[in-house]
Every structure is written in C-alpha cells, then in structure tokens.
Amino acid sequence: MEELINKAQTLVEALPYIRNFYGKTFVIKYGGSTMGDKRLKEKIMEDITLLKYVGVNPVLIHGGGPAISEAMESMDKEARFIQGLRITDSETMSLVEMVLVGKVNKELVSIINRLGGEAVGICGKDGGLIEADKLIFEDKSIDLGHVGSVKKINPEIVLNLIKGGYIPVISPVGSSKEGDTYNINADTVAGKLAVSLKAEKLIFLTDVDGVWSDPSNEKTRVSSLTVNEVKSWIGEGKIKGGMVPKVEACIEAVTCGVNRTHILNGLIPHALLLEIFTDRGIGTMILKER
C-alpha cells in the first residue's frame, strides 16, 4: 500500500508542473552518445510520448555520431576529426545523411509511434527548415568539407506539425541556397530552433550528469548556473570539450527568450520526467539570471 501511496504522491507533485507547461514547446536534443542502450532509448521515447499526452509539445532533435562512425567502419572508411568535428567529404556526407535521416531518425519515429505517439521524421532540408552555410574556421587552412553552420531557421514546417498534433523528430542535416548538403552540430541546431519556436525549454540529453564544478569529479554537479557563470567557467576551463557547444546553445537560447535550459544525463531512466516534473531535478539548469 505504501508503494501505491508514493506513486500517487509523485503524480500530485507533478500537477503544478503539468499545469504550468500545458501547451508549451520543449526542444529536446537527444545525443548519439546516449543511444547505445535500446532499453534506455525506449525509456526516453516513453518520456517524450508522455509529455505529449500531458499537453506539452515536444520537438526532438537527435545526433548519431557513434552510428555514423560504425557505418564508416563497416565500409572501411576512416573517421577523422578536427577539434571534435568530423571531416566530411562528399562520400562521407552521403553516408551521414543515410544514417541520420534514413536509420536513426526513422528508428526513433517508429518507437514513439509504437508507444502511442504520433511522430513525423524530417531533416533540416525538408520545408527549408535549416538554411546552412559551409562552416569556415578562422584558420583558413582547415577544411572540414560538408560541415555546416546554421544561417537561418525557417520553423513553419515544425509549427505545422505541432499544430497537427504530431511530434517532430529532426535530423541535423541542412542545405544551402545553392543546394549543397551539410552535416550540422545537433547542439547548435537545437539551440537555434528553440529560439525560433519561442520554446519554453531547451533540454540536452547527454552522457554526464550535467555540468560539474570540477571537471574531473562527477560528484560536483551543480544544479543551476547563470549565463555569466557559464561564461566564466568556460574561460577558467571548468567547462570544456563537448560540453562547450551545449552550454553555448543554452546561453544563446536563454538570452533570446527561451525560459529555461537543462543539461541531463540521458543514461538515467526517465531523466526527462525526473527533471521536469519533480521538485528535486537531476541535471543542471542554465538560466539568464537568478
């Protein structure tokens, strides 16, 4: 009986959050590093489906780096990186598009639909969603090939899907006005899309428990940071590596009108629900100011 009472209390605890977030849009970035466990993947898709059923409009953007590297290895093609970005020649770009759009995206859509949601998979090329440019380094001698930056987000196709009651699932592949295809950092896409959609929240599901005050100690997670604190920590080297594009996307989002941003460990079952609908939270929230 006590277990049942605790479950009921959990539902009661979620009520004010459900009321506050009803009709709001959450942009959720699901990192490729958290996709390896099929059981956990199912849990995350359950969370997203439940969000839809309680009145939230979830928009899912996914990565897929490990799946791309695995596909390249199966074709005896070496994966090469510069500053964490994949060198993407024309052949690799075709492979990236095939894996992200044709495999990873459709698998996530299929899971959500099987769970009772109505998901539609698209990429940045559909409806002109992501207008991209070639990513240019300050060091002009570095050429990453078909790696792009976001020039413009045209959110109409996503807004129409939300209006129709669907859950958009988006691959971070965009195209230029000239028709060139580009692979774009999914963290960056998520941040810019959240701003364009005037989202209530931007949420990153990654493989660590948020931001740590000591990069070498996972027990030093901080529950919240302001934009100024994040900038300071980047300068001090407390935030580095793959966490940098995530927090930079969070900074842009909250500076441009997104209410809250969160970085969560997607390897924790039901991480989304625990962060959004409980009083405690489990990740790091980044906000404009306290």
Swiss-Prot record:
Its EC number is 2.7.2.8. The keyword Cell inner membrane does not apply. It is found in: Cytoplasm. It catalyses: N-acetyl-L-glutamate + ATP = N-acetyl-L-glutamyl 5-phosphate + ADP. GO terms for molecular function: acetylglutamate kinase activity; ATP binding. It comes from the Bacteria. The record marks 29, 246 as: Transition state stabilizer. Belongs to the acetylglutamate kinase family. ArgB subfamily. This is Acetylglutamate kinase. The gene is argB.
